[in-house]
Amino acid sequence: MSPSGNDPGRAGPAPRFAVVGNPENRRITLFADAVRAAGLPAPRVVPWVAVLRSDGADFPADEIVRLDSPGENPEVDRLLRDAQDPTRVEGSARWYARFTRATRGLRGGVRLDDPDELAVLFDKRRCHATLAAADVPVPWSPTSGAAAEPVRGWDDVRALMRRHRMPRLFVKLAHGSSASGVLAVESSADGRIRATTSVELAPEGALFNSLKVRRYERERDIAAIVDALAPDGLHLERWLPKASLRGRVTDLRIVVVAGRATHAVVRTSSSPLTNLHLGGSRGDLDAVRDAVRAAGGRWTDVLALCERAAACFPHTLCVGVDLLPAIGWRRFAVGEVNAFGDLLPRLTGLPGSGAEGLGTYAAQIAAVLRRTGLGGGLGPPNPSYRPHDAHDVYDAHHQHQQQHRTGTTHASA
């Protein structure tokens, strides 16, 4: 196909894409490469900096508009949360307010997402409530939904732990991602407490995102971290003991495109935090499927659960579902649903998914072409779907910044 995208085999004019993102980021490069590989004109790139400074952007009615992560750009981070140091944790509530306002300021075009759904996806409390209302299994939470009591600090966390008999729980920033501001908290019968987190507590009380997972065992340190995070909003979840592979705790990131589970990555870790940029490792998808079958389950049911979670956001083309397998591999729960959870370079689609041989971006383009009647794309979920092999190659992309500190990234695995 010519670079102009004019193809006599097409039923009409080639679709034109625009992507809102950070032009220097490899997310944009990978998406643009996938668009060109489909024989389409290169997408128009609209920088987040321009959107935030202009309080919006305009798109022609026939331009297909994709939003990508605003993370990993210090100037965008400053505009979203007034952060002079991108490695600081604080300011996620301000980030959320400005980001959701910016998404509502995008005018025209054919959106591949929905501002209302994005507002839910980036609020863990609302997302949890949405999933629970749809009977999608999730870890129990006392902060689920808009009517939940606010958590004003560590004293409230301690009170909720006692009231709901939660000796182990996860404390999360309501608007955080990439494990920023997440604490895995454990208490013992004798009153001792510890927290595992990537948060670095500086002597003056400032909080920094770190690439090093730390363990705090002094309650005053844990209280200081939680008290500093609380003004941005907190979400609490009962700790679901996860299954393991080869002695390492395990979970999965499943990408769902146009209603179909298309890509899967297994994440394993020696700590409660499995994020790959925090020392987690890729796991063996075949071993996961074998474990599910050995427990009497069906892999197709596992994928169907992720599709049910994605169906809660019908106007968002693609989401990344974090799936938590319970010990024994018989039960699963959805930990989170990520709007920008598709950065999985060189990973091709699951056999039988309709995305075989396609990366996550190419699968989305195929789905758009199908919707516009200009390509085969992805069909409806196949009830006989029996994946048997997927070479999950994940290139951990986070670079060390300021030695072992890292800025916000938003919804990477």
Describe the role of every protein-language-model region:
Residues 24-25, 175-178, 241-242, 261, ...:
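Short, solvent-exposed loop/turn segments at secondary-structure junctions
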Residues 104-233:
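Active-site nucleotide/adenylate-binding loops and adjacent lid/helix of ATP-dependent enzymes
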Residues 171, 182-185, 192-198, 250-268, ...:
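Beta-strand scaffold of nucleotide-dependent catalytic cores
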Residues 22-34, 38-159:
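Conserved N-proximal alpha/beta basic substrate-recognition cap immediately N-terminal to
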Residues 83-93, 194-208, 277-288:
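A solvent-exposed, charged loop/short amphipathic helix patch at secondary-structure junctions
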Residues 216-329:
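A long amphipathic alpha-helix within ATP-dependent nucleotide-binding catalytic cores
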Residues 279-318, 325-413:
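C-terminal active-site "lid" helix and adjoining low-complexity regulatory extension at the edge
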Residues 13-18:
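Extreme N-terminal starter segment of soluble prokaryotic enzymes
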